[in-house]
Amino acid sequence: MSSGSRVRGPNSALTEFLRSQGINASALGRARPPRQSEESAGQSTGTESEVIQTPTSVEENNEDENSMSTTTIEIPVVKRRNLRNQKKKKKTDEEAEDNEDTFSMNSRAGFSYKAREHTGKLDFCAHCNCRFTITPYSKYSNSEKGWLCYPCSRGAEDRSVPELRTRKRKALTRKKVAAATMDEEISVPKLQDLCIRVIAEYINDIEAFGDIGQVNMDKISQIISKNRSLNDTTVKLFLSGGQTELKLYDCSKITADSLFQIAQYCPNLQTLHLTYCGQMQDQVLHFYADHLTELTDVSFQGAFLVSSSEWINFFKKRGSKLISLELTDTARIHVSVINAIVDCCPNLISLNLSRIFYLDDECVRLLAGCRNLVSLKIESPGGIINDGSILDVLNQIGSGLHTLSLSGCTKLTDEVLKQGIGPCCGRLKHLNLSGLELLTDDEASIVFGEWKIQSGLETLSLRRCLSLGDKTVRAVLVNSGHTLRTLDLNGMSFVTDEALQYIVNFPLPMLKALDVSWIRGMNDKLVCDFESKKPTLEKLLVWGDNHVLMPSNRLLLIGREVQ
């Protein structure tokens, strides 16, 4: 074959023929990727260049030889150069074929093996009824039971994208509805509430807000505390000179320096509620005792760094004006602190001691000296509290109590009901007995049935009183059914569907919230009965009731498994 001719030999013709039949001839004889071919080509080129340089050097070193010998040496050089060009061209063609194969392997996303069997056949599109040739990339429509032409198959892909977006949008909507249900926000929010949410969203631009007004401050504080956005910068929004009430619901990111600023900027505070104020130290509380002289309502939740001596100092300075006091989540409050509360806070009306590590019978007995108490909450104490200490307190101040919470006092028995609450607490409106697992159904039903209460209970929590059952539920309804607004029966596994049906049929004109979670007898039929027969009922909690599946049209139904 002439070196100047570009006509391919038999191999190229065979390659073209095999390529027309869809067969890659280069892949049959070579089992290495294109990169290896390039490396081998580079090596062969270097070898040939060395071979070609040999006759040239011979010609330069032997200039005295005749021209025939020189011509004999130069002819192979020309042939080898042509051969080298042909090899380069052949390898370039083969590399191009390999690149095309590689590209085709990466672009087979729409390839169909089902269409491969019918490739080349003529058919009519199942969608537009036009005639077309089936290719390996043609799509088969299961809904229309036929092959689709190229335009119709592209349209089917375009239609699938909005369907996917619609499904994602529906899933997101379901999540938002579930979150709103948990937050008890099922109605259309007011414009004022929407504005407050916008302010909370851009709370970091605090300097651009100006004067918002004290009325909406509490709502904004709740929202940004829920978002964990309350910090040293955003807390300044709530501090002003003429402010008399301040409630911060998450102070975990507020340092001691910012806690100092509360007393500096708001010296006229009368109500101060600080939740999760774990960074409060002795110096901060001492500063409050000296500068916040008008305090009457105080709540410190989680101030575990404040020492007992500083608590005593605070109550000595500010206790005479205190009307409401709440202390929770601390291990620094001992008997001496409780004694200071009793001695230095004679006007105390409301007292809440929750999750106090060293609260025991000795501390509780001292509370009998708070003669003016109307609300008493002793919840989840760290020490052991028995019936005797609670009975001593109730015998002294029980007649004046409107609110009593003994939640988490797990060692209390029926004696508290029979000798304390029943005979001594005739003015109670709010009673919380959550977690009192030693109460029995027979004794509790007798106490509630014979309880001579003046106006009836408005809220009652029997959550996790595991031994109570149908008798207690009936006695409670007979005693206070006409005044009950909130009833919590969460976890009372001995309550049957008969007792639930009794609640449905019993007249409860004031009932707004009912918790029947983890009661096996609760089902969809009872939900419908509550919805139709209890017009005042607004919220129904059904956590763990796996027979409640259907949604409610009117009630705020919280806790469905499919929610």
UniProtKB/Swiss-Prot annotation:
GO BP annotations of the record are:
nucleotide-excision repair
Name the residue ranges with Basic residues bias.
78-90
Protein keywords: DNA damage, DNA repair, Nucleus
InterPro entries xref list: Leu-rich_rpt_Cys-con_subtyp (IPR006553), LRR_dom_sf (IPR032675), Znf_Tbcl_Rhp7 (IPR056451)
Report one GO cellular component.
mitotic spindle pole body
**Chief place of localization:** nucleus
Chain spans, region Disordered: 1-101
Q: Where is the composition biased (Polar residues)?
A: 39-59
Write one Pfam family the protein is assigned to.
zf_Tbcl_Rhp7
Q: Key word Nucleus present in the record?
A: yes
The listed locations are: Nucleus
Q: Which PANTHER family match?
A: PARTNER OF PAIRED, ISOFORM B-RELATED
User: Which function does this protein serve?
Assistant: Involved in global genome repair (GGR) via nucleotide excision repair (NER), in conjunction with rhp16, after UV irradiation.
Which protein family is it in? Answer: Belongs to the RAD7 family.
Stated name of the protein? DNA repair protein rhp7
Organism, per UniProt? Schizosaccharomyces pombe (strain 972 / ATCC 24843)
Which gene underlies this protein? rhp7
